[in-house]
Design a protein with these regions (language model features):
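Periplasmic c-type cytochrome electron-transfer domains
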Residues: 6, 21-344
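Hydrophobic h-region of N-terminal signal peptides that target proteins for export
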Residues: 11-18
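Bacterial N-terminal signal peptides that target proteins for export
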Residues: 1-8
Length: 344
C-alpha cells in the first residue's frame, strides 16, 4: 500500500480527507488559499523533450499505417483516434480479425508522463515498446482471450520492402536494423509525444477566470473534497497510474489475472486519465456506463462489496446539482479536436 493511500484512508476515517489534503498541499506549494492549493496540484508539466525528431516522425508514420498488422487493414490509430484523446468510443475494441476483444482501448494522451508505471488495463506491459510489440505479435491489441500469433517476420519484411520506410529508418536509426524491436521503438517514441491539447481547465488553472463556468468551479471543489475523485484521478493527468477494484459488475479479473498472488488486485483495473473524458463515452474497462451521469451514480453507491474492492470506494451522497457540477467540471478537461499531433 502506498504512503498516499495510507494517508487518504486515515483521513477518510477521520472525516477530514478533503480539508486535510488541501491544507497539506497549500503548505507545500505556498498557496494562499485552499482553491489556490487545489489548482497548484493540477498545473501541467512541460512536454517531454524530443531528442530524435526523425524517430518521432517514423513512429508517427508507423502508428497510422495498417502495413504493420497481419491483415494490412488495422493500424494503431484504429483504436486510438487523436480527436478522442487517442482513444475510441467503442465499448469494446476489435482485434485485427474484426472480432470484439474483452475490453475497450485506453486513451494514450499524456502516456509519456506515466514513467515506469505498468501499462494497459491490467498492467501486463511494462513499457510502451512491450505494448506495441504485443499488439503486433498477437494481432489482438493484447485484449483478446484467444490471441492469434502473428509471424512478425512478415511485418518486418513488409517494412524493409518499403523504400520510404528504409530511408526513414536510415535517417532515424542509421546503425540499427529494421526489425520488430526498432519498429516498436519508433512507435513508442512517437506515443511519448502525445500531449493532451490545452483544455478550458488548463486556461483556468493559469488564471483565465472566464475559461470555465461557475458550475465547473464548484465541481472542481467537489472533485477534490466531498466526492473523493482526487483519491485516484489526481494530478494534471488525472490518474494515479495504479490499479483498483472499484466494484464494477464484471467477471474480468483484470490485474488479478496478472498478479495472481495478490488478493487485493482481483477485479482491479488501471485508473484511466480523465483528460478528454467527455469525448469518449461509454466508460469503464467494458464500457459498462453509458454516460458520466451513470459513472457518478456508480461511485455514489460505492460499487459491489467484495473482499478486493478498494477501501477508497466509499458510498457518497450527491445532490442533483452537485452531480451536474462534477460533470460540468469534467467537461472542461477536453481539448477538442485540437489534440496535439506531431508534425510529420
Amino acid at each position: 500500500m502506498t504512503t498516499f493511500l495510507q494517508a487518504i484512508l486515515f483521513l477518510l476515517a477521520s472525516g477530514t480527507v478533503g480539508q486535510s489534503y488541501l491544507t497539506a498541499a497549500a503548505a507545500q506549494s505556498g498557496a494562499s488559499s485552499h482553491l489556490d492549493a487545489m489548482k497548484s496540484l493540477y498545473r501541467r508539466e512541460p512536454p517531454l523533450p524530443v531528442t530524435n525528431q526523425p524517430l518521432v516522425d517514423l513512429g508517427r508514420d508507423l502508428f497510422f499505417d495498417p502495413l504493420i498488422s497481419a491483415s494490412g487493414t488495422t493500424a494503431c490509430v484504429s483504436c486510438h483516434l487523436p480527436q478522442l484523446g487517442w482513444a475510441v468510443t467503442d465499448p469494446k475494441s476489435r482485434n485485427d480479425s474484426g472480432k470484439l476483444t474483452s475490453r475497450r482501448s485506453q486513451p494514450l494522451t499524456g502516456i509519456g508522463h506515466a514513467g515506469k508505471a505498468p501499462l494497459g488495463w491490467d498492467g501486463r506491459n511494462p513499457t510502451l515498446e512491450a505494448q506495441a510489440k504485443a499488439s503486433i505479435a498477437t494481432g489482438s491489441m493484447s485484449m483478446s482471450a484467444t490471441p492469434t500469433p502473428v509471424k512478425v517476420e512478415i511485418i518486418e519484411e513488409r517494412v524493409r520492402a518499403n523504400a520510404a520506410y528504409v530511408a526513414k529508418f536510415k535517417a532515424a536509426l542509421p546503425d540499427a536494423p529494421i526489425n520488430i524491436d526498432t519498429i516498436v521503438l519508433a512507435i513508442a517514441v512517437f506515443e511519448r509525444t502525445l500531449e493532451p491539447a490545452v483544455a478550458p481547465f488548463d486556461r483556468w488553472i493559469e488564471g483565465d477566470q472566464a475559461a470555465i463556468s461557475e458550475s465547473a468551479k464548484r465541481g472542481f471543489e467537489l472533485y477534490n473534497g466531498k466526492a473523493l475523485c482526487f483519491t485516484c484521478h489526481r494530478g494534471w493527468r488525472f490518474t494515479d497510474d495504479l490499479f483498483h477494484d472499484i466494484g464494477t459488475t464484471s467477471t474480468d479479473r483484470g490485474r488479478g489475472a496478472v498478479v495472481k498472488d495478490d488478493p487485493s488486485m482481483q477485479f482491479a483495473f488501471k485508473t484511466p486519465t480523465l483528460r478528454d473524458v467527455a469525448l469518449r463515452p461509454p466508460y469503464m474497462h467494458h464500457g459498462q456506463q453509458a454516460t458520466l451521469d451513470e459513472v457518478m451514480r456508480h461511485y455514489e453507491k460505492g460499487g459491489i462489496d467484495r473482499p478486493s474492492r478498494s477501501p477508497l470506494m466509499q458510498p457518497i451522497v450527491l445532490t442533483n446539482e452537485e452531480r451536474q457540477d462534477l460533470i460540468a467540471f469534467m467537461e472542461t478537461l477536453s481539448g477538442g479536436s485540437g489534440a496535439a499531433v506531431p508534425k510529420r
